[in-house]
Each structure stands twice: as C-alpha cells, then as structure tokens.
Amino acid sequence: MKLLMLTNPLAGRRRGLAVAEKSLEMFRQRGITVENVFSDRPGHLVEVAAREVNGDWDGIVALGGDGTLFEVINGMMKGNPDLPIPLGVLPAGTGNSFSRDLGIRTHADAFEMIAAGATRRIDLGECQCADTRFVFINILGFGFVSDVAQKAYSYRQWGALNYVIGVFIITRSLKSYPLEFEIDGRSIQRDNIFVEISNSRKTGGDMIMAPDALIDDGLLDVVILNKLSRLRLLSALPRIFAGTHLKMKEVEHFTGRSMSFRTTPAKVLTPDGEIAGTTPITVNVLPGKIRVFG
C-alpha cells in the first residue's frame, strides 16, 4: 500500500506533529509506504490534495481535525470530482467530530482502519453560495453557533476559553432573524437563532447536534433553533451534548436531499468548523460520493 499523508502540524494545539511522527513509524512497521506533507499555511492542503488526487496513491490520509478534513476533501474535489482514491482519517484535532461517526475512538482505531485497506462509501454535503462552492463532510451551520465560532477565533490566544468568551459576547447581543428555507420542495419561514445542516451526528467534539444522522443514508439532517430568550438559550446548549435538545419546543428537525436558505441579514457560514461564505445558500447531499477507509 502506498499512501499520501497530509498533516496539519498545528492541529490539536500542536499535537499534529507528534501524531504524525507516531503514525509514520506505525506505517513503516506494517510495511506501508507513506509520503507525508506538512501544511505550512491555510489552504496549503487544498492545493496538495487537488494535485495529488490523480496521483499513483492507494489513498490520501488527512491527519488533523475537522478543519483539516475540510481542506483535504475540497482539494480532492477540485482536482477530480470523481474522487478516484479513498480517504483515510487520522484524528489529531481538538474536536475530531467526524471521526467518531466512523467508529474511531483512538489513534489505534484509525490506524488499523487504514492499514486494513477496506473502504466504505459515505455521503458528502455540497453548498453553493454567492461567492464560493464547497463540500462538507461533517456539518454546515449559520446563526448563533457560527457567530460564536467567528467571535471565538478573534480570542484564540485565550486557548480553550475562547469559546466561553464567544458564547458570552454573542448571547449578550442575541437577536433572532427572519429565515426562509425550502427542503425538498417544502417552503418554511421562521424567526431563527441558528441552523445546523448535518451529515454526521456530532460537532464540536461530543456535541450530538443531529442524533439520528447517518453518514451513508443519502440524507442531510437539519436542526433549527427558533426565537427564544437568552436564559432559555443558555439552558439549551448543555442539552446538545446529550442530544436531548430536539425535545425542546423551539427546536425543529428536518431531513432532506436538496434545500435552500435565505436570511436577513446575510449570515456567515461555518462548514466543518471553518469560516467560508454567507447566506443565501443552496445545499445538496452527494450520496456515496467518497470512499473512506473503515
């Protein structure tokens, strides 16, 4: 087996480098040939994956967090939308949400899945907005959760506290907004707080945003939170870790294959934890689009 490993050395608060070194040694012991490329700037792995997806590889391995997966998959799609080679996942980020839906709990789990060589097909989501098009493997959101992520990024020097700061600031200025959306031909209007479009169950590590989502069912799960008080919002957030937020009267859950969303004003998007584009958007599921080791 000959693999290309694309590594974010800064993933998981700089754990990526150590995980890469450990992985390379484990592959060597199994007689698996691996060429490793370290990311040296945002977007670097997009460029490498786009170029190498047509290369003589038995697979491309993404080593990092959900954001690393986002770069690698979009690079592969850019280089060849047919995605001729499978993707391997070696989680080394702070969240690693998607890897949990593959059944990965430890580095050893991930390594064995890749070394075994067996693959399965899973879905991707595709998003088109005014200025960009991209695919996502985990989740696409906008509204409160995305606003918090954007605000937290500006406080990243505070480490893990940055999200607490983001929640506090965005909650203080909480405002609902008009949302118009259509799912598989059904038109709906709401006074909204956030929308999360999920391919997999989890986000942000162990937050079970879409408890019923499956990565190979040909559907996307849409969870929306409608207008509520600040206090009610703060009580809702812990419920997401248990997946019980769907029982709240302000929460609605939909599934679909094709959907569009329009907000006033435009809202920033966070695909797989990254920041890219704004509403309005059109989103489609790409059933069985990519092969993954596992």
Walk through the language-model features, giving the residues of each.
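Short Gly/Thr/Asp-enriched flexible loops that form oxyanion-binding sites at enzyme active sites
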Residues: 68-82
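Gly/Ser/Thr-rich active-site loops/lids in small-molecule metabolic enzymes
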Residues: 156-162, 206, 211-232
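Catalytic core of DAGKc-family lipid kinases
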Residues: 30, 39, 78-193
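Glycine-rich phosphate/pyrophosphate-binding beta-alpha loops
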Residues: 141, 145, 196-209, 275
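Glycine-rich beta-strand-to-loop/alpha-helix junction loops that act as flexible
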Residues: 9, 63-65, 90-92
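Short glycine/serine/threonine-rich phosphate/pyrophosphate-binding segments
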Residues: 45, 67-72, 97, 122
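ATP/nucleoside-binding phosphotransfer catalytic cores, i.e., glycine-rich phosphate-binding loops
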Residues: 183, 214-215, 224-294
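ATP/NTP phosphate-donor binding region
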Residues: 1-60, 186
